[in-house]
Amino acid sequence: MLTNDDKTEIRELVSRYNKAIDTGDADGYAATFTSDGEFVGIVGTFKGHDDLRAFAADYATNPEMADFASAQHWVTNLVVDGDGDDATAFSHLMMVKPDGEQGSIILVGHYDDTLRRVDGNWRFARRVVNAAAYPGNTGS
């Protein structure tokens, strides 16, 4: 069973991830993952620190992700389970893009996370975005 400290550290990891991707901190983004960590998103799968760093650096300028460039990741309803050095987490995701006087929600979905403690620090081993609504989604 995870301790309250473990759960707090995992919540902090989620927040550091959001801050890094929203502010263009590619090194900080990659550092939230294990060295062999994997991110599975709507524009592809990225594995390992070099690939993750390149994805984060390209995030704001890649035409495939243009709708997301100025958006903020809002994550809530985080549920963490696990034991020892392994954990899973579920959270709801909403991406909000500032538009003048208002903001608009441009993505709704959830994350499924697999986490591992490495050298005393929690990291994402795998983070999967399950997007239900986003620009360009034609449904299934």
Where are these regions (language model features)?
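Short beta-strand edge/turn micro-motifs at domain boundaries
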Residues: 88, 108-138
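Short, surface-exposed coil-to-beta transition loops
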Residues: 73-75, 106-111
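A solvent-exposed, acidic/Ser-Thr-rich amphipathic alpha-helical stretch
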Residues: 26-93
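Beta-strand elements of well-folded, non-transmembrane domains
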Residues: 93-99, 117, 131
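A short, polar/proline- and glycine-enriched secondary-structure boundary/capping micro-motif
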Residues: 99-104, 134-140
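Binding-site signature for planar aromatic cofactors or substrates
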Residues: 5-14, 53, 90-92, 140
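Short helix-to-loop capping/linker segments positioned immediately adjacent to catalytic or ligand/cofactor-binding
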Residues: 19, 63-68, 100-101
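Short, low-complexity N-terminal intrinsically disordered segments enriched in polar/charged residues
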Residues: 1-32
